């Protein structure tokens, strides 16, 4: 997906970018360069943040606990010359925030693919989401996600902050898609 975007948009024709894949129990930070992929998993995800910190306020009070290990990984990569030029987000929270912003009644991965979100978009959509009644939240994202969505949005904002990016590129392709593509490419070589 990135290779195709690099062909059509010079903004993404860079030697290094970082992909953040935020899950329920962990989040992966992946520095992608021409020399290879440098990744690390951190034991903080959306559900884990909700279970551990119980409130957004507590998560924000304890943000250093979350961010210091990530900051060390970022600094290690920068010392090795891996300074990301743009941020890619492919997990459920950023794609969902993009769909909210676009006013999609039904999620469509093709519509969010390649869109750009700014920090202010995450803040605005968090505010809009929190203004809904709990029942409206459940109707929008489902019973099992209604209470974790705010944690996901705040956590991703913290990740953007520590990475020092104001915007991120939204892609809706994950590990399975990447593995499938690599498998196809390996067979073609």
Could you say what each language-model-derived stretch is?
Residues 25-28:
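Acidic, divalent-metal-coordinating active-site segment for phosphoryl/phosphodiester hydrolysis
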Residues 2-16, 31-189:
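Helical "lid/coupling" subdomains associated with nucleotide-phosphate turnover
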Residues 21:
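Conserved catalytic-loop position in the HRD/HxD motif
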């Amino acid at each position: 997906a990135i290779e195709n975007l690099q062909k059509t948009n010079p903004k993404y024709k860079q030697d290094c970018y970082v992909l953040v894949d935020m899950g329920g129990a962990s989040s992966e930070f992946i520095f992608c360069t021409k020399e290879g992929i440098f990744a690390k998993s951190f034991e903080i995800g959306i559900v884990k943040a909700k279970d551990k910190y119980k409130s957004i306020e507590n998560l924000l009070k304890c943000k250093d606990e979350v961010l210091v290990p990530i900051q060390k990984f970022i600094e290690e990569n920068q010392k090795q010359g891996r300074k990301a030029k743009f941020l890619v987000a492919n997990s459920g929270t950023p794609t969902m925030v993009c769909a909210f912003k676009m006013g999609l009644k039904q999620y469509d991965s093709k519509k969010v693919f390649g869109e750009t979100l700014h920090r202010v978009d995450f803040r605005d959509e968090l505010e809009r989401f929190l203004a809904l009644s709990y029942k409206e939240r459940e109707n929008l994202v489902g019973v099992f996600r209604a209470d974790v969505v705010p944690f996901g949005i705040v956590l991703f904002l913290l990740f953007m902050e520590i990475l020092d990016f104001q915007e991120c590129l939204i892609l809706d392709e994950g590990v399975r898609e990447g593995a499938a593509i690599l498998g196809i490419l390996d067979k073609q070589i």
